[in-house]
Protein backbone atom coordinates (compact mmCIF):
# COMPACT_ATOMS: atom_id res chain seq x y z
CA UNK A 1 0.00 0.00 0.00
CA UNK A 2 2.97 2.30 -0.46
CA UNK A 3 1.59 3.74 -3.73
CA UNK A 4 -1.37 5.99 -2.89
CA UNK A 5 -2.79 5.79 -6.42
CA UNK A 6 -3.33 2.05 -5.94
CA UNK A 7 -5.67 2.83 -3.07
CA UNK A 8 -7.88 5.29 -4.92
CA UNK A 9 -10.20 3.59 -7.44
CA UNK A 10 -11.50 5.73 -10.28
CA UNK A 11 -15.14 6.64 -10.74
CA UNK A 12 -17.75 8.02 -8.44
CA UNK A 13 -19.37 4.96 -6.84
CA UNK A 14 -19.00 3.92 -3.25
CA UNK A 15 -15.20 3.72 -3.56
CA UNK A 16 -14.25 1.74 -0.47
CA UNK A 17 -11.01 0.05 0.50
CA UNK A 18 -10.56 -2.41 3.34
CA UNK A 19 -8.00 -1.41 5.97
CA UNK A 20 -6.84 -2.80 9.30
CA UNK A 21 -7.67 -0.40 12.13
CA UNK A 22 -5.03 0.88 14.51
CA UNK A 23 -7.22 1.72 17.48
CA UNK A 24 -11.01 1.52 17.69
CA UNK A 25 -12.71 3.55 14.98
CA UNK A 26 -16.30 4.79 14.99
CA UNK A 27 -18.57 4.89 11.94
CA UNK A 28 -18.04 8.06 9.90
CA UNK A 29 -14.60 8.66 11.43
CA UNK A 30 -11.96 10.47 9.38
CA UNK A 31 -8.85 8.30 9.26
CA UNK A 32 -5.17 8.73 8.41
CA UNK A 33 -2.89 6.24 6.69
CA UNK A 34 0.05 5.09 8.81
CA UNK A 35 3.45 4.00 7.54
CA UNK A 36 2.60 0.34 8.21
CA UNK A 37 -0.49 0.48 5.97
CA UNK A 38 -3.05 0.51 8.79
CA UNK A 39 -5.35 3.45 9.49
CA UNK A 40 -5.88 5.46 12.66
CA UNK A 41 -8.29 8.21 13.65
CA UNK A 42 -7.35 11.69 12.51
CA UNK A 43 -6.61 13.56 15.73
CA UNK A 44 -4.64 16.48 17.06
CA UNK A 45 -2.98 17.70 20.21
CA UNK A 46 -3.49 21.28 21.37
CA UNK A 47 -0.52 23.46 22.26
CA UNK A 48 -0.21 24.15 25.97
CA UNK A 49 1.98 24.50 29.05
CA UNK A 50 1.57 22.66 32.35
CA UNK A 51 1.98 24.09 35.82
CA UNK A 52 5.40 25.18 37.08
CA UNK A 53 7.35 23.05 39.56
CA UNK A 54 10.39 24.24 41.50
CA UNK A 55 13.54 22.13 41.25
CA UNK A 56 15.88 24.48 43.12
CA UNK A 57 15.40 27.03 45.88
CA UNK A 58 17.64 30.06 46.04
CA UNK A 59 19.40 31.59 43.07
CA UNK A 60 20.62 29.39 40.23
CA UNK A 61 22.13 30.11 36.83
CA UNK A 62 23.02 28.39 33.57
CA UNK A 63 20.48 25.58 33.29
CA UNK A 64 21.29 22.76 30.86
CA UNK A 65 19.46 19.49 30.33
CA UNK A 66 19.15 16.18 28.53
CA UNK A 67 16.72 13.27 28.30
CA UNK A 68 17.91 9.89 29.57
CA UNK A 69 16.00 7.57 27.22
CA UNK A 70 16.93 4.43 29.15
CA UNK A 71 15.65 5.75 32.47
CA UNK A 72 12.85 7.77 30.89
CA UNK A 73 13.91 10.82 32.89
CA UNK A 74 14.95 14.42 32.36
CA UNK A 75 18.28 15.48 33.86
CA UNK A 76 18.84 19.19 34.53
CA UNK A 77 22.16 20.63 35.65
CA UNK A 78 22.86 24.11 36.93
CA UNK A 79 25.13 26.37 38.92
CA UNK A 80 23.76 26.79 42.44
CA UNK A 81 24.70 30.35 43.34
CA UNK A 82 23.18 29.86 46.79
CA UNK A 83 25.73 27.13 47.52
CA UNK A 84 29.05 28.69 46.46
CA UNK A 85 28.35 27.97 42.80
CA UNK A 86 28.20 24.18 43.23
CA UNK A 87 27.57 22.17 40.07
CA UNK A 88 24.27 20.45 40.75
CA UNK A 89 21.99 17.95 39.01
CA UNK A 90 18.37 16.99 39.48
CA UNK A 91 16.23 14.26 37.91
CA UNK A 92 12.80 15.14 36.55
CA UNK A 93 9.85 12.83 35.87
CA UNK A 94 7.29 13.90 33.28
CA UNK A 95 3.72 12.67 33.78
CA UNK A 96 1.13 14.07 31.42
CA UNK A 97 1.56 17.83 31.45
CA UNK A 98 3.39 18.03 34.78
CA UNK A 99 6.92 17.39 35.98
CA UNK A 100 8.25 16.43 39.41
CA UNK A 101 11.82 16.41 40.64
CA UNK A 102 13.94 14.28 42.93
CA UNK A 103 16.51 15.62 45.37
CA UNK A 104 19.38 17.70 44.04
CA UNK A 105 22.80 15.98 43.78
CA UNK A 106 26.09 17.92 43.69
CA UNK A 107 28.65 16.81 41.10
CA UNK A 108 31.21 19.58 41.76
CA UNK A 109 31.65 21.54 45.00
CA UNK A 110 35.10 23.10 44.62
CA UNK A 111 35.44 26.28 46.66
CA UNK A 112 35.25 29.21 46.52
CA UNK A 113 33.40 29.46 43.18
CA UNK A 114 32.19 25.98 42.21
CA UNK A 115 31.56 25.68 38.47
CA UNK A 116 31.80 28.38 35.84
CA UNK A 117 28.44 29.11 34.24
CA UNK A 118 29.57 29.41 30.62
CA UNK A 119 31.40 26.11 30.97
CA UNK A 120 28.39 23.91 31.72
CA UNK A 121 27.16 21.32 29.21
CA UNK A 122 25.52 17.88 29.15
CA UNK A 123 24.99 15.03 26.67
CA UNK A 124 23.42 11.57 26.75
CA UNK A 125 25.46 8.56 25.60
CA UNK A 126 22.87 6.18 24.12
CA UNK A 127 25.36 3.31 23.88
CA UNK A 128 26.55 3.47 27.49
CA UNK A 129 23.14 4.74 28.68
CA UNK A 130 24.91 7.36 30.75
CA UNK A 131 24.80 11.11 31.15
CA UNK A 132 28.04 13.00 30.50
CA UNK A 133 28.58 16.45 32.02
CA UNK A 134 31.42 18.66 30.79
CA UNK A 135 32.15 21.70 32.91
CA UNK A 136 34.72 24.19 34.18
CA UNK A 137 35.94 23.96 37.77
CA UNK A 138 36.23 27.59 38.76
CA UNK A 139 39.42 28.47 40.65
CA UNK A 140 39.65 31.96 39.24
CA UNK A 141 40.83 33.04 42.70
CA UNK A 142 44.19 31.54 41.74
CA UNK A 143 43.81 32.26 38.02
CA UNK A 144 42.82 28.76 36.95
CA UNK A 145 39.72 27.32 35.23
CA UNK A 146 40.03 23.53 35.09
CA UNK A 147 38.48 21.37 32.36
CA UNK A 148 36.45 18.61 33.96
CA UNK A 149 33.83 16.02 33.05
CA UNK A 150 31.91 13.38 34.93
CA UNK A 151 29.65 10.44 34.08
CA UNK A 152 26.22 10.24 35.68
CA UNK A 153 23.95 7.23 36.19
CA UNK A 154 20.23 7.81 36.67
CA UNK A 155 18.38 5.48 39.03
CA UNK A 156 14.78 6.22 39.85
CA UNK A 157 14.53 9.89 40.75
CA UNK A 158 18.21 10.29 41.65
CA UNK A 159 21.57 10.39 39.91
CA UNK A 160 25.03 9.27 41.01
CA UNK A 161 28.40 10.20 39.58
CA UNK A 162 31.77 8.62 38.92
CA UNK A 163 35.09 10.37 39.46
CA UNK A 164 35.62 13.60 37.55
CA UNK A 165 38.17 13.51 34.73
CA UNK A 166 40.03 16.30 32.90
CA UNK A 167 39.16 16.66 29.21
CA UNK A 168 42.10 19.05 28.72
CA UNK A 169 45.39 19.27 30.61
CA UNK A 170 45.57 23.05 30.30
CA UNK A 171 44.67 25.20 33.28
CA UNK A 172 42.24 27.62 31.69
CA UNK A 173 39.20 26.72 29.57
CA UNK A 174 35.77 28.25 28.98
CA UNK A 175 32.71 28.16 26.68
CA UNK A 176 32.20 24.41 26.89
CA UNK A 177 29.65 22.45 24.86
CA UNK A 178 29.28 18.73 24.22
CA UNK A 179 27.40 16.44 21.85
CA UNK A 180 27.08 12.69 21.37
CA UNK A 181 28.10 11.05 18.08
CA UNK A 182 25.87 7.98 17.96
CA UNK A 183 27.70 6.42 15.00
CA UNK A 184 31.16 6.65 16.55
CA UNK A 185 29.63 6.15 20.02
CA UNK A 186 31.72 9.01 21.34
CA UNK A 187 31.16 12.28 23.18
CA UNK A 188 32.69 15.38 21.61
CA UNK A 189 33.50 18.38 23.79
CA UNK A 190 34.14 21.79 22.22
CA UNK A 191 35.66 24.61 24.22
CA UNK A 192 37.84 27.70 24.36
CA UNK A 193 41.41 27.05 25.54
CA UNK A 194 42.80 30.16 27.23
CA UNK A 195 46.35 28.81 27.59
CA UNK A 196 48.80 30.21 26.79
CA UNK A 197 46.74 33.35 26.25
CA UNK A 198 45.52 32.31 22.80
CA UNK A 199 41.81 31.53 23.44
CA UNK A 200 41.64 29.15 20.45
CA UNK A 201 38.72 26.85 19.73
CA UNK A 202 39.40 23.19 20.56
CA UNK A 203 37.52 19.90 20.49
CA UNK A 204 38.27 16.55 22.07
CA UNK A 205 36.73 13.06 21.81
CA UNK A 206 35.59 11.19 24.91
CA UNK A 207 34.87 7.49 25.43
CA UNK A 208 32.56 6.36 28.22
CA UNK A 209 33.36 3.11 30.01
CA UNK A 210 31.24 2.24 33.01
CA UNK A 211 31.10 5.30 35.23
CA UNK A 212 34.25 6.89 33.83
CA UNK A 213 35.29 8.69 30.66
CA UNK A 214 38.64 8.99 28.90
CA UNK A 215 39.74 11.45 26.25
CA UNK A 216 41.91 11.58 23.16
CA UNK A 217 44.15 14.47 22.20
CA UNK A 218 42.49 17.90 21.84
CA UNK A 219 42.39 19.31 18.29
CA UNK A 220 42.24 22.96 17.23
CA UNK A 221 39.26 23.89 15.05
CA UNK A 222 39.78 27.67 15.09
CA UNK A 223 43.22 29.26 15.46
CA UNK A 224 41.81 32.54 16.76
CA UNK A 225 39.89 33.73 19.79
CA UNK A 226 36.75 31.58 20.05
CA UNK A 227 33.75 31.90 22.35
CA UNK A 228 30.14 30.68 22.64
CA UNK A 229 30.77 27.21 21.17
CA UNK A 230 27.73 25.00 20.59
CA UNK A 231 28.13 21.42 19.36
CA UNK A 232 25.48 19.17 17.80
CA UNK A 233 25.44 15.88 15.89
CA UNK A 234 24.21 15.53 12.29
CA UNK A 235 22.93 11.94 12.22
CA UNK A 236 22.27 12.06 8.47
CA UNK A 237 25.89 12.78 7.58
CA UNK A 238 27.48 11.33 10.73
CA UNK A 239 29.23 14.59 11.49
CA UNK A 240 29.70 16.92 14.43
CA UNK A 241 28.70 20.53 13.74
CA UNK A 242 30.27 23.24 15.90
CA UNK A 243 28.95 26.79 15.72
CA UNK A 244 30.83 29.53 17.50
CA UNK A 245 31.51 33.21 17.85
CA UNK A 246 34.77 33.90 16.05
CA UNK A 247 36.11 36.71 18.20
CA UNK A 248 39.21 36.72 16.02
CA UNK A 249 37.00 37.65 13.04
CA UNK A 250 34.82 40.52 14.25
CA UNK A 251 32.78 38.14 16.48
CA UNK A 252 31.05 36.72 13.40
CA UNK A 253 28.90 33.61 13.68
CA UNK A 254 30.88 30.73 12.20
CA UNK A 255 30.40 27.00 11.72
CA UNK A 256 32.62 24.02 11.02
CA UNK A 257 32.19 20.27 10.45
CA UNK A 258 34.04 17.65 12.49
CA UNK A 259 34.58 13.97 11.68
CA UNK A 260 35.20 11.56 14.55
CA UNK A 261 37.58 8.66 13.96
CA UNK A 262 38.49 6.55 16.94
CA UNK A 263 39.50 8.89 19.72
CA UNK A 264 40.33 11.80 17.43
CA UNK A 265 38.45 14.40 15.40
CA UNK A 266 39.35 16.25 12.21
CA UNK A 267 37.77 19.33 10.71
CA UNK A 268 36.82 20.77 7.34
CA UNK A 269 36.93 24.44 6.42
CA UNK A 270 34.98 26.91 8.54
CA UNK A 271 32.29 29.14 7.03
CA UNK A 272 30.58 32.29 8.28
CA UNK A 273 26.82 32.07 8.78
CA UNK A 274 26.32 35.59 10.13
CA UNK A 275 28.63 38.51 9.35
CA UNK A 276 27.43 40.25 12.49
CA UNK A 277 28.22 40.06 16.20
CA UNK A 278 26.43 37.00 17.60
CA UNK A 279 25.62 35.91 21.13
CA UNK A 280 23.70 33.19 23.02
CA UNK A 281 24.40 30.58 20.33
CA UNK A 282 22.47 27.30 20.40
CA UNK A 283 22.16 24.54 17.80
CA UNK A 284 20.51 21.20 17.16
CA UNK A 285 19.91 18.75 14.32
CA UNK A 286 16.49 18.63 12.66
CA UNK A 287 16.07 14.98 11.64
CA UNK A 288 13.02 15.60 9.44
CA UNK A 289 14.88 18.12 7.27
CA UNK A 290 18.35 16.60 7.74
CA UNK A 291 19.65 20.06 8.56
CA UNK A 292 21.20 21.77 11.56
CA UNK A 293 19.45 24.85 12.92
CA UNK A 294 21.58 27.50 14.63
CA UNK A 295 19.84 30.11 16.77
CA UNK A 296 21.45 33.24 18.16
CA UNK A 297 21.01 36.81 19.27
CA UNK A 298 22.08 39.33 16.64
CA UNK A 299 23.94 41.95 18.63
CA UNK A 300 24.36 44.03 15.49
CA UNK A 301 20.57 44.40 15.33
CA UNK A 302 19.60 45.23 18.92
CA UNK A 303 19.87 41.59 19.97
CA UNK A 304 17.07 40.32 17.72
CA UNK A 305 16.46 36.57 17.87
CA UNK A 306 17.69 35.00 14.64
CA UNK A 307 18.20 31.53 13.20
CA UNK A 308 19.89 30.04 10.16
CA UNK A 309 19.82 26.64 8.45
CA UNK A 310 23.11 24.77 8.02
CA UNK A 311 23.70 22.10 5.38
CA UNK A 312 26.52 19.59 5.70
CA UNK A 313 28.10 18.08 2.58
CA UNK A 314 31.10 15.92 3.25
CA UNK A 315 33.35 18.02 5.46
CA UNK A 316 31.96 21.32 4.17
CA UNK A 317 29.15 23.42 5.62
CA UNK A 318 26.94 26.03 3.96
CA UNK A 319 24.13 28.23 5.19
CA UNK A 320 20.85 29.68 4.11
CA UNK A 321 19.82 33.26 4.81
CA UNK A 322 19.36 34.20 8.49
CA UNK A 323 15.72 34.74 9.52
CA UNK A 324 14.52 36.79 12.49
CA UNK A 325 12.10 35.06 14.86
CA UNK A 326 11.88 37.82 17.48
CA UNK A 327 12.31 41.46 16.46
CA UNK A 328 13.27 42.52 19.97
CA UNK A 329 16.15 41.93 22.36
CA UNK A 330 16.46 38.16 22.82
CA UNK A 331 18.66 36.35 25.33
CA UNK A 332 19.26 33.02 27.10
CA UNK A 333 18.25 30.87 24.17
CA UNK A 334 17.60 27.14 24.27
CA UNK A 335 16.85 24.73 21.43
CA UNK A 336 15.39 21.23 20.97
CA UNK A 337 14.12 19.12 18.08
CA UNK A 338 10.61 17.64 18.44
CA UNK A 339 10.35 14.57 16.16
CA UNK A 340 6.61 14.06 16.61
CA UNK A 341 5.95 17.54 15.20
CA UNK A 342 8.93 17.54 12.82
CA UNK A 343 9.82 20.96 14.15
CA UNK A 344 12.52 22.58 16.25
CA UNK A 345 11.54 24.77 19.17
CA UNK A 346 13.59 27.74 20.32
CA UNK A 347 13.07 29.03 23.86
CA UNK A 348 14.29 32.42 25.01
CA UNK A 349 13.96 35.37 27.31
CA UNK A 350 11.94 37.98 25.42
CA UNK A 351 13.46 41.20 26.75
CA UNK A 352 11.06 43.15 24.56
CA UNK A 353 8.13 41.59 26.45
CA UNK A 354 9.01 42.02 30.14
CA UNK A 355 11.60 39.24 29.95
CA UNK A 356 8.88 36.57 29.66
CA UNK A 357 9.82 32.99 28.87
CA UNK A 358 8.83 32.53 25.24
CA UNK A 359 9.18 29.98 22.47
CA UNK A 360 8.67 29.64 18.74
CA UNK A 361 8.40 26.56 16.56
CA UNK A 362 10.74 26.44 13.56
CA UNK A 363 9.91 24.64 10.32
CA UNK A 364 12.78 23.99 7.93
CA UNK A 365 12.20 23.80 4.18
CA UNK A 366 15.31 23.37 2.09
CA UNK A 367 17.80 25.97 3.26
CA UNK A 368 15.18 28.30 4.72
CA UNK A 369 13.30 28.38 8.01
CA UNK A 370 9.95 29.83 9.02
CA UNK A 371 8.48 30.36 12.47
CA UNK A 372 5.18 30.04 14.28
CA UNK A 373 3.72 32.82 16.36
CA UNK A 374 5.29 33.25 19.79
CA UNK A 375 4.04 31.20 22.73
CA UNK A 376 4.60 32.41 26.30
CA UNK A 377 5.49 29.54 28.62
CA UNK A 378 6.29 31.71 31.66
CA UNK A 379 4.57 35.08 32.09
CA UNK A 380 7.22 36.36 34.47
CA UNK A 381 10.83 37.44 34.11
CA UNK A 382 12.69 34.31 32.95
CA UNK A 383 16.29 33.42 32.10
CA UNK A 384 18.57 30.46 31.26
CA UNK A 385 15.84 28.65 29.31
CA UNK A 386 16.54 25.01 28.45
CA UNK A 387 14.08 22.80 26.51
CA UNK A 388 14.47 19.00 26.64
CA UNK A 389 12.39 16.78 24.36
CA UNK A 390 11.09 13.70 26.16
CA UNK A 391 8.43 11.61 24.38
CA UNK A 392 4.97 11.95 22.82
CA UNK A 393 5.42 15.59 21.83
CA UNK A 394 6.26 16.69 25.37
CA UNK A 395 9.11 19.13 26.05
CA UNK A 396 10.36 19.75 29.59
CA UNK A 397 11.61 23.32 30.00
CA UNK A 398 13.96 24.30 32.81
CA UNK A 399 14.60 27.96 33.63
CA UNK A 400 15.36 30.58 36.24
CA UNK A 401 12.19 32.43 37.25
CA UNK A 402 12.10 36.01 38.52
CA UNK A 403 15.88 36.03 39.14
CA UNK A 404 15.42 33.47 41.89
CA UNK A 405 14.43 29.80 41.96
CA UNK A 406 14.81 27.15 39.29
CA UNK A 407 11.54 25.97 37.78
CA UNK A 408 10.40 23.41 35.27
CA UNK A 409 7.23 22.98 33.25
CA UNK A 410 6.02 20.72 30.45
CA UNK A 411 5.18 22.14 27.03
CA UNK A 412 2.88 20.16 24.76
CA UNK A 413 3.73 20.60 21.09
CA UNK A 414 0.68 20.97 18.84
CA UNK A 415 0.45 18.16 16.32
CA UNK A 416 -1.99 16.47 13.97
CA UNK A 417 -1.97 13.64 11.46
CA UNK A 418 -4.60 15.32 9.27
CA UNK A 419 -2.10 15.63 6.40
CA UNK A 420 -2.19 11.81 6.16
CA UNK A 421 -5.98 11.73 5.68
CA UNK A 422 -6.99 8.78 3.50
CA UNK A 423 -10.76 8.52 3.93
CA UNK A 424 -13.82 8.08 6.17
CA UNK A 425 -14.93 4.83 7.78
CA UNK A 426 -18.05 3.27 6.33
CA UNK A 427 -18.71 1.43 9.58
CA UNK A 428 -17.31 1.04 13.09
CA UNK A 429 -14.06 -0.97 13.11
CA UNK A 430 -12.60 -2.63 16.18
CA UNK A 431 -8.90 -2.34 16.94
CA UNK A 432 -6.84 -4.66 14.65
CA UNK A 433 -10.02 -5.62 12.75
CA UNK A 434 -10.52 -5.02 9.03
CA UNK A 435 -13.22 -2.68 7.77
CA UNK A 436 -14.27 -0.51 4.84
CA UNK A 437 -13.05 3.05 4.40
CA UNK A 438 -14.57 5.38 1.80
CA UNK A 439 -11.71 7.05 -0.06
CA UNK A 440 -11.60 9.96 -2.50
CA UNK A 441 -13.99 9.40 -5.40
CA UNK A 442 -16.49 7.70 -3.10
CA UNK A 443 -19.51 8.65 -1.03
CA UNK A 444 -19.72 8.40 2.74
CA UNK A 445 -23.19 8.12 4.26
CA UNK A 446 -22.23 7.96 7.94
CA UNK A 447 -22.34 11.68 8.79
CA UNK A 448 -24.89 13.87 10.55
CA UNK A 449 -25.81 17.55 10.57
CA UNK A 450 -24.17 18.44 7.27
CA UNK A 451 -25.29 21.51 5.31
CA UNK A 452 -26.28 20.52 1.78
CA UNK A 453 -24.11 22.11 -0.90
CA UNK A 454 -21.34 23.12 1.49
CA UNK A 455 -17.71 22.09 1.09
CA UNK A 456 -16.18 20.24 4.03
CA UNK A 457 -12.61 20.05 5.27
CA UNK A 458 -10.76 17.86 7.76
CA UNK A 459 -9.77 19.82 10.88
CA UNK A 460 -6.68 19.11 12.98
CA UNK A 461 -8.80 17.25 15.56
CA UNK A 462 -10.36 14.99 12.91
CA UNK A 463 -13.78 16.63 12.71
CA UNK A 464 -15.35 17.76 9.44
CA UNK A 465 -16.10 21.46 9.12
CA UNK A 466 -16.87 24.10 6.53
CA UNK A 467 -13.84 25.99 7.86
CA UNK A 468 -11.20 25.75 5.15
CA UNK A 469 -8.06 23.74 5.91
CA UNK A 470 -5.33 22.19 3.81
CA UNK A 471 -7.33 18.95 3.55
CA UNK A 472 -10.55 19.26 1.55
CA UNK A 473 -12.83 16.22 1.60
CA UNK A 474 -15.77 17.09 -0.63
CA UNK A 475 -19.33 18.44 -0.67
CA UNK A 476 -22.40 17.51 1.35
CA UNK A 477 -25.25 16.16 -0.76
CA UNK A 478 -27.50 15.48 2.22
CA UNK A 479 -27.40 15.96 5.98
CA UNK A 480 -25.80 12.52 6.34
CA UNK A 481 -23.89 12.11 3.07
CA UNK A 482 -20.72 13.65 1.71
CA UNK A 483 -19.57 13.30 -1.87
CA UNK A 484 -15.81 12.90 -1.60
CA UNK A 485 -13.71 14.54 -4.30
CA UNK A 486 -12.53 12.36 -7.16
CA UNK A 487 -8.78 12.94 -7.29
CA UNK A 488 -8.48 10.98 -10.52
Question: How would you name each of these model-derived features?
Answer:
Residues 1-74, 78-80, 88-95, 110-130, ...:
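Extracellular receptor-binding modules and their adjoining Ser/Thr/Gly/Asp/Asn-rich linkers
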